[in-house]
Amino acid sequence: MMQFHFQFYVGPVFTLRPSKGFLSTCLVSFLFVTTTFCSYAIADLNSDRQALLAFAASVPHLRRLNWNSTNHICKSWVGVTCTSDGTSVHALRLPGIGLLGPIPPNTLGKLESLRILSLRSNLLSGNLPPDIHSLPSLDYIYLQHNNFSGEVPSFVSRQLNILDLSFNSFTGKIPATFQNLKQLTGLSLQNNKLSGPVPNLDTVSLRRLNLSNNHLNGSIPSALGGFPSSSFSGNTLLCGLPLQPCATSSPPPSLTPHISTPPLPPFPHKEGSKRKLHVSTIIPIAAGGAALLLLITVIILCCCIKKKDKREDSIVKVKTLTEKAKQEFGSGVQEPEKNKLVFFNGCSYNFDLEDLLRASAEVLGKGSYGTAYKAVLEESTTVVVKRLKEVAAGKREFEQQMEIISRVGNHPSVVPLRAYYYSKDEKLMVCDYYPAGNLSSLLHGNRGSEKTPLDWDSRVKITLSAAKGIAHLHAAGGPKFSHGNIKSSNVIMKQESDACISDFGLTPLMAVPIAPMRGAGYRAPEVMETRKHTHKSDVYSFGVLILEMLTGKSPVQSPSRDDMVDLPRWVQSVVREEWTSEVFDIELMRFQNIEEEMVQMLQIAMACVAQVPEVRPTMDDVVRMIEEIRVSDSETTRPSSDDNSKPKDSNVQV
């Protein structure tokens, strides 16, 4: 251990000055600690890389993995997710890729920071290596639909939240050590070969439990009696709530004392009437017996039907958002076409269509081309699923357009397309999910004194990001490729002041609208007439978007139901009459020294919404002009604090 010695000299001057040797020692120590930390971080990631490469080399797989030493493990390896600091692997998701055989030891068990392990729907077999169930940080384990065997291991991770080992060949008893998993909320062990009693899990925070279709026996612990009967069905030797009550070992003794009764006197009859009595009695008894048997059969059938209906009702009651999602954006999926979700190269997602249909769904919004859903899959993966409506294109044309959208979407300011699905009745698109919302919600949502307004700097940065994204689409897609649906709700916030565009390139797939709406909204005048979108019509729509950002008003204003005025016309009328600050968003009035920049941005917008398409600038020109505003801003020092002063009146030539 390194020790530091200080010497104090008592004298007329009480000053403590560290020696040069001490400072040098501190500096060396600091560099040593920093270097050691970085070395450990690099070593951890290299160790994880070698462990995964060893796993891929030892376990055959039908689907090709892009794992190699040249690709960056955290950025491009399929199914691999790293920690936020990029020092180790924290999630491995490889469902349904055809993994075959046992998991070798000293491979996945060396991923010491692993939190999520999903190898479901493969052909894996054998026992789970001890080093896997000894991983200390596992939160979610999905190993269902494989052929694992042996006893269910005792997982040591105290933070284990979900454990799914269903549809395997595990044998033996359910470990009593599961009581120690205080954070466990979901346990799925159905369709195995487990035997023995059900352990008491009263110390566990279970919300979902399924032990059905095993060989369990004994009484169900009272702490688990609140789960539905479907959680325990298929275990014939299991009893207790919610199943049938457990029978006692021997019948209880009768409380009624035994009283001997004398035999009944013989029924008097004549010898000659013996045959007549026999015939007259047999026929009614036979008829009555048949009627009784028929009645019993009917009662049994009614009970079975009622029990089946009751079971189906209970199943309906426990349906989650999963089934709701399947009905919403999976209602048109055809059974023969399941699992035909098409992923694009470079996509790190690894799930199939059935996983997507099982995901919980939340409606994000309904737009011109369909409804967008936030889908949360079971491995904590969140994506956006766009369910398209009124698609007129055939399968080949649809697939070709998806390829183009994926190719041109490779830009920081564009939301990338990750996968798609096509069938006769259902068309789906899968994109990344960004939790920060969109520009429309920032501008118009929850306006008032309690809302933090979107400041001017953020508005300019967001506008510039969107402009760069559209300019990239025009350059990468060629002269015939346009966005076609530019609006504030399609400007998605990646993080603060950083945005990207979505919902582009879908116009060629859609049926031609029957008639335009009364208000123009974001659409250029020529689009209202020809129904054709071009680069210039995108420029017009982007000009409307800038006006929306400047004014804080929606692009279609309705002073009254009978009088609808589009935003460009309203701004032009205000400017032509006499320029006032009323055209700008009132929430911008608190910021100082931004009048000149707002006027410059307004001039850009008015150039974009020119009636004649040829007069409008290109998107590259728009990007350049906005960047010039940013340059002038950096050269001018102005306070960023709030101020109640209003911008001065300015003159704008339109």
UniProtKB/Swiss-Prot annotation:
The modification Phosphothreonine is found at T381, T530. SUPFAM superfamilies: L domain-like (SSF52058), Protein kinase-like (PK-like) (SSF56112). Coiled coil: none annotated. LRR repeats lie at residues 113-135, 137-158, 159-182, 183-204, 205-228. The chain crosses the membrane at residues 282-302. Residues 1-38 form the signal peptide. The protein kinase domain is predicted to be catalytically inactive. Belongs to the protein kinase superfamily. This is Probable inactive receptor kinase At5g58300. It comes from Arabidopsis thaliana (Mouse-ear cress). The lineage of its organism: Eukaryota, Viridiplantae, Streptophyta, Embryophyta, Tracheophyta.
